[in-house]
Amino acid sequence: MSKSALLVLEDGTVFRGISIGADGSAIGEVVFNTSMTGYQEILTDPSYSQQIVTLTYPHIGNTGTNSEDEESNSIHAQGLVIRDLPLLASNFRNERSLSDYLKSQNIVGIAEIDTRKLTRILREKGAQNGCIMAGDNLDEALALDKAKEFPGLKGMDLAKVVTTAETYQWKQGSWTLLDGLPEAKDDSELPYHVVAYDFGAKRNILRMLVDRGCRLTVVPAQTSAEDVLAMNPDGVFLSNGPGDPEPCTYAIEATKTFLDIGLPIFGICLGHQILALASGAKTVKMKFGHHGANHPVKDIDRDVVMITSQNHGFAADEATLPDTLRATHKSLFDGSLQGIHRTDKPAFSFQGHPEASPGPTDAAPLFDHFIELIKLSVNEARSA
């Protein structure tokens, strides 16, 4: 028999449903994601730290879960909100039902609520703090108090919370249908050494860099520029991650150093915002952010439209871009800035997720541009 659950927003709105995860409570910023598939990748994306994820597609859990689709070692979303959990999970890769997966990691979830109504509230009022309670002892008043007590993501440095504790090497490429996840590549197959800052990095980003010949040294978020330069990298990657970029002064200062010496830099999501801040631009908190796998973005340089995967609640403010930065991509949903490129340095970034997982791969050529910048830099160093 299903246990009861409730979701209470900070404005006092109450949704009652059934529990699909662990007993207990979860507090965070409630956001909505419009992806139809990829719920396991979404849950394990560290960028969702301190957020309760509402999935707008009505049927979630159809394909179960498996060990190969995780984007990190654990679920990072605070809680999950869905309309309907199918009785059966059917897929040849299924290892565990979504409900069991949530319970195994002590994650609270709620189903059988009106997610359309919830999404309209978030769209019109903006992202709200909320509290999910699940189990036998549900207390609306207590849940409301907890939701109101949550400080919000503005000013919250979460990159140093979700980052790796130790530096490590990554040499594994992408999953394929026939072979699954491959063995780590030999150094002889990886001609470029890239140091990747882990602000909450997704595994598929690392895999796509390896696919293009990068031997990755993944370092903690607070690693100094001096320590990175001692590793003699051919380029630096600034990963995605959760929270507000402005408090990440350690990353901003390190990026300034890399810019000064002309090291190739590629940033994604939070890394995009950090590059913007290091270059003199400002960032802003968005009303409800972009979360989904169907966001149209215009590539200004190529004059084409890409369908992209998005997951961010902050954005670089185009009005504050200095002369050394030019806009390269814009959202066709709200006109917000989606990409920048330094005019004087081999550095660029993208707000969306070119690695997808889940989502389309229209923006994957951005990885190729990073390799082009690395090749130019390496050739210039050799001829100097």
Swiss-Prot record:
Keywords: Amino-acid biosynthesis, Arginine biosynthesis, ATP-binding, Glutamine amidotransferase, Ligase, Nucleotide-binding, Pyrimidine biosynthesis. It holds the Pfam family GATase. GO terms for biological process: 'de novo' pyrimidine nucleobase biosynthetic process; 'de novo' UMP biosynthetic process; glutamine metabolic process; L-arginine biosynthetic process. Residues 1-189 are annotated as: CPSase. Its EC number is 6.3.5.5. L-glutamine binds at S47, G241, G243, L270, Q273, N311, G313, F314. Small subunit of the glutamine-dependent carbamoyl phosphate synthetase (CPSase). CPSase catalyzes the formation of carbamoyl phosphate from the ammonia moiety of glutamine, carbonate, and phosphate donated by ATP, constituting the first step of 2 biosynthetic pathways, one leading to arginine and/or urea and the other to pyrimidine nucleotides. The small subunit (glutamine amidotransferase) binds and cleaves glutamine to supply the large subunit with the substrate ammonia. This is Carbamoyl phosphate synthase small chain.
